[in-house]
Design a protein with these regions (language model features):
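Glycine-rich phosphate-binding loops of nucleotide-dependent enzymes
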Residues: 2-239
């Protein structure tokens, strides 16, 4: 079963076509990585999936429902969760309080249910030891973990990760990869935009390559990275 599917989705900003008839589907439980040069349309693609942008053409389906014109908050309630490139937690709140806000926002849940979910997510993201630490005092790695945890606290069926490994040392990156691999092994469906290629290939089953808003390749990571067109466009290597 495809959890999310895009069919010929295009988005223009004035005369600029940012995504051009993009089509792909992600089955439930799969992890898809998205790569491409800066300005290729990757973040716009995320905004089309979350409902922050409406496409000028094409269709977005989630959980078998046409959500093309549904607002972002509806999609959050349906199970679309997202992290952002630059973590922006509530600096004056503790790690636990940041999660509790995300877990309870607009959902009418009991305090006991929120607490249970937050503790589980803190354990899954290795933040339980920092539950009572103010978010403003966290290291970059732990801010990234908190960004991931806040996305998980919304109860997603689909987790969108936007360059979450950026700026980390190799050791920090490996620690974050281990966390994401664990979430994926538990059944989480993931779409992950990333420039740190080895982070992606450690987790995802497929890679999609965007260039000037067009899909130029999608498939197993080894096959994609062996592609002449991908090597020339993305890696700048003549093959």
């Amino acid at each position: 079963m495809n959890l999310v599917e895009l069919q010929d989705v295009s988005k223009n900003f004035g005369a600029l076509k940012v995504t051009d008839a993009v089509s792909f589907a992600v089955p439930k439980g799969q992890a898809l990585g998205i790569i491409g040069p800066n300005g290729a349309g990757k973040s716009t693609l995320f905004n089309l999936i979350t409902g922050n942008f409406a496409p000028d053409a094409g269709r977005v389906t989630f959980l078998g429902q046409d959500v093309t014109r549904r607002p972002a908050m509806d999609r959050v309630r349906m199970g679309v969760g997202r992290s952002f490139q630059i973590p922006q937690p509530f600096e004056g709140l503790t790690v636990y309080e940041n999660l509790a806000v995300a877990a309870s926002f607009g959902r009418g849940r009991s305090e006991a249910a929120v607490t249970q979910d937050c503790i589980r997510i803190l354990e899954d993201t290795e933040l339980l030891r920092l539950a009572n630490t103010q978010a403003g005092a966290l290291s970059l790695l732990d801010r990234k973990r908190l960004e991931l945890a806040r996305a998980m606290a919304t109860g997603p069926e689909l987790l969108l990760l936007d360059e979450i490994a950026g700026g980390l040392t190799e050791g920090e990156c490996q620690a974050l990869i281990a966390t994401i691999k664990r979430l994926h092994a538990q059944g989480m469906t993931i779409i992950w935009i990333e420039h740190v290629l080895h982070a992606l290939t450690a987790v995802v089953e497929r890679l999609l390559v965007l260039d000037f808003g067009r899909v130029i390749g999608i498939g197993a990571p080894d096959a994609i990275m062996a592609s002449k067109e991908v090597r020339e466009i993305y890696l700048g290597i003549e093959a």
